[in-house]
């Protein structure tokens, strides 16, 4: 099978053996994988001599299931998430805890965003906001867009902000939510709807160059508000500002509890439902449910899928910052 890797700063397409089925795992014939621009461009830049697999979010068809898998059968369409089990490869061997059924109403292309969706959902959960509270979403790349949409679907008062017009216009077109390009106008609107109190939470979804926003977020927040780091931002929080407002600083790690835990992933042992309500697997299911019920829309984030041979040029385009495209979908059909 073909698999996309990075080595010495270059994209490589290599041949690998199709994985053999094992207990508690599902062998998936890949239909689509979604590129996560920030993560994969960074991995490409940092790659050394050894091949590093790229990708972590996919959809496909279950072709074989191991002993212990009860919720999926061969022939089912599935969405799956999480490196090293999920990558830009023609076949994937995925633990049952990281594989969910795709309902009839959801396309396989949409479902290939499941990993990015789980990350967005976990970021929102980290903030522990309640409906009616005010959430500023700064940075409308793919994660900011998804967080803003899901927050809006959860009846939060969302104030989206991005300093480039195309991404702001895209979010406003999809959601109908007033979106801001100018920081000053966003601050005026925040002051208006919060009656001068500030936001309950600020989601920082921009890239490393937007580190200044960590301090800015504290100005936007109410007393004891929450600043949540989602993007690859280098934090620069001023202690006096933190102290003055008793700001809560949070960071969101991937798709939720279970990520990078060998017991949950490699051994495919789920956490007890009553103690860990929202694992990464259950966040995946929730993202698919939101798609199924048309509570969020990801169709406008995707253009025609690309071929596996076009990945290098696609990453170059994304790295150059094409503001109209937030991701690329690779087709294996």
Residue ranges and their predicted role:
Residues 19-34, 43-84:
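Glycine-rich beta-strand-centered segment in the early N-terminal region that forms part
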Residues 25, 32, 57-59, 76-77, ...:
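Residue-level marker of beta-strand positions
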Residues 82-95:
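A structural motif shared across PLP-dependent enzymes of the aminotransferase-like
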Residues 109-184:
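Mid-domain Rossmann-like dinucleotide-binding core that forms the NAD(H)/NADP(H) cofactor-binding site
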Residues 178-252, 258:
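Glycine-rich cofactor phosphate-binding loops and adjacent beta1-alpha1 units
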Residues 196, 285-305, 312-333:
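C-terminal capping/lid region of NAD(P)-dependent oxidoreductase domains
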Residues 239-301:
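C-terminal substrate-binding/catalytic core of Rossmann-like NAD(P)-dependent dehydrogenases/reductases
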